């Protein structure tokens, strides 16, 4: 290969790599749960009156949900899950007075960038 051909190939390779870097989209661009009340795996002495989840991105209200389930498999929340009108990164649901036991919080959210996150965590109310 001539010197001129090597230089042309190197320029082409550099241009291709630069284009790939500039056009790449972030792989981790999706809503991440940053905190919750109650916290995951918490053991509580007090009965919570709601579950609140905060994410690192704004959520699409029509496609975001959270529910709370007993260890017997019964949904126990009030069914009023909603994205906060004053904070589009917060999702909450009201709880009735719950008896002691283990509970599972299940959530599915769609961030405004179009990524769906489906996950869960547990908490326990002490006897």
Q: What are the functions of these language-model segments?
A:
Residues 24-26:
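N-terminal signal peptide c-region/cleavage motif recognized by signal peptidases
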Residues 52, 57-79:
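Short, surface-exposed alpha-helix to beta-strand junction/turn motifs within ectodomains of secreted
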Residues 86-92:
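Aromatic sugar-binding surface patches on proteins
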């Amino acid at each position: 290969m001539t010197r001129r051909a090597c230089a042309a190939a190197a320029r082409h390779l550099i241009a291709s790599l630069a284009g790939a870097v500039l056009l790449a989209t972030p792989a981790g661009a999706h809503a991440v749960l940053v905190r919750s009340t109650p916290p995951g795996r918490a053991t509580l002495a007090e009965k919570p009156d709601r579950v609140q989840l905060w994410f690192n991105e704004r959520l699409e209200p029509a496609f975001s949900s959270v529910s709370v389930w007993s260890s017997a498999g019964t949904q126990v929340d009030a069914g009023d899950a909603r994205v906060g009108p004053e904070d589009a990164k917060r999702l909450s649901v009201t709880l009735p007075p719950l008896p002691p036991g283990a509970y599972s919080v299940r959530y599915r959210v769609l961030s405004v960038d179009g990524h769906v996150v489906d996950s869960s965590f547990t908490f326990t109310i002490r006897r």
